[in-house]
Design a protein with these regions (language model features):
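Short, intrinsically disordered, charge-biased short linear motifs at domain edges
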Residues: 26-40, 70-82, 225-227, 357-360
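A short alpha-helix capping/helix-coil boundary motif
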Residues: 16-19, 28, 60-62, 71, ...
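Short N-terminal secondary-structure initiator segments
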Residues: 2-11, 30-41, 48, 173-190
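Iron-sulfur cluster-binding electron-transfer modules in prokaryotic oxidoreductases
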Residues: 103, 107-440
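Non-heme iron-sulfur electron-transfer modules
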Residues: 2-24, 50-84, 98-128, 427-433
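Short low-complexity stretches enriched in small and charged residues
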Residues: 2-11, 44-50, 155-164, 230
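Cysteine-centered iron-sulfur cluster-binding motifs in ferredoxin-type domains/subunits
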Residues: 36-55, 77-101, 116, 140, ...
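Intrinsically disordered, low-complexity regions enriched in small/polar residues
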Residues: 12, 20, 53, 57, ...
């Protein structure tokens, strides 16, 4: 594509950077130039109209108010466009002008949104909602300290009204259940915890599995064991930092990343692969840590990025080895509906959870790639709950077929979204395989 006839060049400005270690990253004038350029290119392309509301909002401003003049968009309207992005990453996957594809325009809309949020939240106090949603480890610890009361109250109308009015968490949003026992406590009890020991793999169970659904982690350990994969569990891991970073909180992201690197790198340097159960966490460690950390931490992040795998991805890579186990006691169902999470698609590594289930069980699998609309904390917020349901409707409808009784997704939060809006909670691929190995 050649440069268009407007006064705004499609070529990168001198303000182009996606690296927060670069002083230019924090220059608001430089950011505004890049936003203007990006809006101009997106206005001429419009391939991403079907994803989040950022693009329809941008196009509505240009078509209905400003006759296509990007320069007329006001700062508050830019804020509205940025707020509608929930970091699904699908626009970057599909963009023909991306850095990933080596195009000279070097577009990355999600990273531009992150930059905007980082600049506009820098040195400002965080809201109570952002403190709670951006720190799932702390929120879960508080919930567990209530001895089960939090789980009860999260389903009581008056309490949900309070959460909506004072925290901005939608009263109708199905919230995750908090487990009485963490995955780490279970692993400690079974003597699975190891420190700086040589292991083939080490598990990053994720904050969701740690606090909300330890069973997924247990199933993962079980499936790895069935395939003779040596896996170490470790103490003290923190959230990957994505909930904080989606709000522009770079400081918390970097602190969590540094903490996790301190624990994981000794294993990585001995040759261990790191298996993270949630695609979002894999994406953060594979793509975001190396780009967002600085100094020695960036070097360590690159080592981790080379070692990170999804459990299904790791098992798929050993499928031709003699230890790979296809001896099952139960076929879950003849046909399965599989949802591919956005952050798995963003990595470009294929759908190994789906492929693994098909290879081991022989089930026919229908694949649905539309976004479910949950996207981290987006679906929880009062201002975006309805939009998340609307955005996810195609995926809800796509999963429903008369011949499928079992639904699968690699993302536990997507499973929560399907449970609420489609009436079926998909299982994790590791849980499907664990059942297949054991059930009769």
């Amino acid at each position: 594509m050649v440069e268009n006839q407007s006064r705004i060049s499609y070529l990168p400005t001198d303000g182009l950077t996606y690296d927060p270690s670069d002083s230019m990253y924090w220059d608001k004038t430089a950011l505004d130039k890049e936003i203007e350029r990006t809006f101009e290119i997106c206005h001429g392309c419009r391939m991403c109209f079907k994803y989040c509301d950022s693009f329809p909002t941008l196009f509505n401003f240009l078509d209905k108010q400003y006759e296509g003049e990007v320069k007329k968009i006001k700062p508050q309207e830019t804020q509205q466009i940025m707020d509608a992005c929930f970091q699904c990453k699908l626009c970057e996957v599909q963009c023909p002008y991306s850095i990933r594809d080596g195009h000279e325009f070097k577009l990355d809309f999600p990273k531009l949104v992150h930059r905007h949020k980082a600049i506009h939240s820098k040195d400002k106090p965080k809201s109570l909602r952002n403190n709670i949603l951006g720190n799932p480890d702390k929120s879960a610890s508080m919930a567990r300290a209530s001895l089960g009361l939090a789980n009860v109250m999260n389903r009581v109308g008056i309490h949900r009204w309070f959460l909506e009015k004072f925290l901005g968490i939608h009263r109708n949003k199905l919230l995750p259940y908090f487990s009485f026992t963490t995955f780490e406590q279970w692993a400690t009890k079974l003597a699975l915890i190891r420190e700086n020991d040589k292991a083939e793999t080490v598990l990053f169970q994720t904050c969701y599995v740690q606090h909300n659904e330890p069973q997924i982690g247990k199933d993962t350990i079980d499936v790895l064991d069935k395939n003779k994969v040596d896996c170490a569990c470790v103490k003290g891991l923190k959230c990957c930092g994505m909930p904080a970073w989606e709000q522009g909180d770079l400081e918390t992201l970097r602190a969590n990343a540094k903490h996790n690197l301190d624990i994981l790198i000794p294993f990585v340097e001995q040759g261990s692969k790191v298996l993270a159960i949630n695609p979002t966490c894999v994406m953060m460690m594979r793509r975001e840590y190396p780009a967002l950390l600085e100094g020695d931490d960036r070097e360590r992040a690159n080592k981790l990025a080379d070692a990170i795998n999804d459990p299904s991805e790791f098992l798929w890579n050993i499928r031709n080895e003699s230890r790979f186990n296809t001896n099952i006691n139960n076929v879950p169902t003849e046909t399965i509906s599989y949802h591919a999470p956005c952050h798995l698609r963003a990595q470009g590594v294929g759908f190994k959870g789906r492929d693994l289930i098909k290879k081991v069980t022989g089930s026919k699998i229908k694949t649905v790639i539309e976004c479910c609309g949950h996207d981290g904390t987006y679906a929880m917020k009062v201002e975006s709950f309805d939009a998340s349901k609307r955005i996810g409707q195609k995926s809800f409808d796509g999963m429903k077929t008369e011949e499928t009784e079992v639904w699968v997704t690699d993302c536990p939060l997507a499973a929560l979204q399907f449970k609420q809006h489609a009436g079926v909670k998909p299982k994790h691929p590791m849980s499907i395989l664990a059942d297949a190995y054991h059930s009769k």
